[in-house]
Amino acid sequence: MKVSISHKNNFKGVSYQAQALLMSKSVFAKSPYAKLCKSFGFEGEGKFFLQEQALLLVCVEELGLDSIREAGASIARHFRTLPYKNVNVALNGKLDDSKAYALLLGALLGVYECVSYKTKTPPLHLKEIILLDEKNEVASESVLKKVHIVAQSVNEVREIINTIPQVATPKYLAKYAKELSKEVGNLECKILDEEALQKEKMGAFLAVNRASCNPPRLIHLSYKPKGAKKRIVLVGKGLTYDCGGLSLKPADFMVTMKADKSGGCAVMGIIKAIAQLGANIEVHSIIGAAENMIGGNAYKPDDVLYSREGKSIEVRNTDAEGRLVLVDCLSYAQDLKPDILIDFATLTGACVVALGEFTSGIMGHNDRLKAQFEKCALESGELMATLPFNRHLKKLIESKIADVCNVGSSRYGGAISAGLFLSEFIREEFKQKWLHIDIAGPAYVEKEWDINPSGASGAGVRAGIEFILAQGKA
């Protein structure tokens, strides 16, 4: 399906065309449709389809960007399997670039669903959603360019996260990254295999993957435009499957663990979009791709691991593995001398407990940087909130036999203590330049919500893109 913007209404009333009208509840109440719709019990909240007119009415409380974005998804979903090839969409109110972008992005992201493993799928009749801009209020070319690039990146990230673990191994992610660099053209790709990881002394990363028959990979994608204003390095947790290791997860908790690679997939999606948009920011995406499995060679609670930074780590829980992969990747990332360093990870269930399944957690030492990222995230349509570090929780990761322990000694504050663990491996010169984004909640939800399908949402991609674009304007 594609989206477009038209400066005149081409609706001819033919059988393959439909219309959608988006309006606020207050406007609906005064509209000529109100009396008819109310006779069918529709009071102006949600959507109502007038079949004879092939007209979908979509009513929202007010025409804010979040409501418009979600309405775009609702329109696309409604017509997804109906026998209409194109839908003309009109917004009853002033149109501008941000509203047009929100509606069309919502449509492209809302229509996505993972059907790769179904043997029978309903046909997608809908070919195009056309936004009407009769007053010529929208910079159509730039809006459409960004919409298509961002939507494609998010949907590709969703698809690779949804890819099953028997297919999506660390080698698979590495192959995908190589193909991505060739497709985009202005991306470079470097892959570190097991031998290279040993030379890099990534003892924590390697320990996590030890019991897997699928070897680990570190993936390094880079976008280096001439005269770049800043260098931003992104790090993503790429656990292609996580059974918990010897600290084995309960069976119900293992389901959906194919999504433990969401952070790694997100940073690939972000750099792809940034490169295609031609942003004047140098960006690197580093993905630690591994599997946390069980076996005679598995790393164990009571082990002490040595990280690339030289710090020793007492292992008390092998299911706190993502942070072990991340610390070695963050060490590698700091060698690139970033102006800003951000990691994305489905790191803790505790973050979901703290913020719910629709909101990501932002952590770090720089309040201004955290506020900037949260602002960009909210503008992109992603819910994020700051979780504050504190000295009391830091004491929970102290170890009596090593430099630091991989889990806190309390059942409380797990999202923050995990962030504080990562902070132990951030060099002093980068403390104020680093952010940790825990996307454990929204990365994979087993129900449709907002503009997201059941399954992978592509959490972090839109927020990361907007943040980097904002840095280019700063």
From Swiss-Prot:
Cofactor note: Binds 2 manganese ions per subunit.
Broad class of where this protein is predominantly found: cytoplasm
Keyword Transferase listed: no
EC primary class: hydrolase
Molecular function (Gene Ontology), one example: manganese ion binding
Name of the protein described by the UniProt record: Probable cytosol aminopeptidase
Reactions mediated catalytically: Release of an N-terminal amino acid, Xaa-|-Yaa-, in which Xaa is preferably Leu, but may be other amino acids including Pro although not Arg or Lys, and Yaa may be Pro. Amino acid amides and methyl esters are also readily hydrolyzed, but rates on arylamides are exceedingly low; Release of an N-terminal amino acid, preferentially leucine, but not glutamic or aspartic acids
PROSITE patterns, sorted: CYTOSOL_AP (PS00631)
Gene: pepA
EC number: 3.4.11.1, 3.4.11.10
Active site: 249, 323
A GO BP entry: proteolysis
InterPro entries: Leucine_aapep/pepB, Macro_dom-like, Peptidase_M17_C, Peptidase_M17_leu_NH2_pept, Peptidase_M17_N
Lineage: Bacteria, Pseudomonadati, Campylobacterota, Epsilonproteobacteria, Campylobacterales
Cofactor: Mn(2+)
GO cellular component annotations of the record: cytoplasm
Localization per Swiss-Prot or TrEMBL: Cytoplasm
Biological role: Presumably involved in the processing and regular turnover of intracellular proteins. Catalyzes the removal of unsubstituted N-terminal amino acids from various peptides.
Binding-site residues for Mn(2+) 2, renumbered to this chain: 237, 242, 260, 321
Annotated positions binding Mn(2+) 1: 242, 319, 321
Organism this protein belongs to: Helicobacter hepaticus (strain ATCC 51449 / 3B1)
